[in-house]
């Protein structure tokens, strides 16, 4: 039997060893056969993946999905800090009866210190509308609209920490670095208005939420699809040139830059990043006139300002949020595809957001007044103008709160096991309540749903299949809903 030459290195001997060669060859052929089998049975996600065709020179051009769309635009009202379901939408008479008693079965695992006893809802609930839906006295204006709403009472989250939970709600993942739902939507569908951003995030007058730009970031999608953040009182930074730069000089510089970019693009026609950069510069130039116009509310009638509460000098935070609500309506009116409207700011022991750990009733008296009338006026205004026919409105928060007070305090701890989202507008069946939490509002027990289900439903109403909308990143087929998510059919019209 011939032997291997002595001067072959050890790695070379391994490569020339016949047993090793045939063994690894057979293993590789088996892997190829398995791959073909999985493809033939549609068990590999890429087989069903759908990627939109995005023109490099017009990344925001309007596009259509694979399904028939019920909604054209989306408006998300996001209450940062975890607004309590027990003080808003989820009526629990048994919690009233058990007020002051220990938690049945012993205290649960909590986020911030030991748990105290069960605590009744801090507001009275009353039947509202023709449906008689029980809604808290904290929300009289929104409560009057319940016949137009669909309630999902059994949302669950993967985490009880604010930042990761905001990430999960907005991106489908608790980690940083994933695209927000608004970025996914605008990547897939573009926008109707080419003079305004396709995706706008409107921060609360008190500041930005804890997960910050993750809520409107593009993640690994092209950066052109990230949200643009501005409000009625704080327009886009650096929108205009410095005072020292004349209009003529600014126009000349812009023209020169455009000429150089276009010359470079002609030499490199396949450079999609350069094409996207040119498109972004052109949009920025158009925004110099369109954004000041859209944020100037002087053309709004006194009746409209009063309806929203935007003319109330006694409460500048509420008036500021009301003006943001008017801005949101104006953006939807102009065809902006996706609008995020934030109510509440960074973690502040509940003083600037809905994180009511210590003094829930005292703080919610403030937050409820800020949020209720302006948000209800926004929904009414959209409906009166016929905009709800093709606009989906979603009210949500990152998780719920516990049915007991924290020990030694008058507030509730974090609870990701059952909380409420409210939907209205395009494609939504009005007047329905989906799912139930247990008798004290501690956890979802019937028709349990997840944030993935909510996001899958939003995509479905826009004509997008959450199981197929896919972007390959680092060799992985990524989706907003990962490998999860079901459409919430019972709330759809």
Please state what every model-predicted region is.
Residues 1-493:
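Ligand-binding pockets and gating/stacking loops
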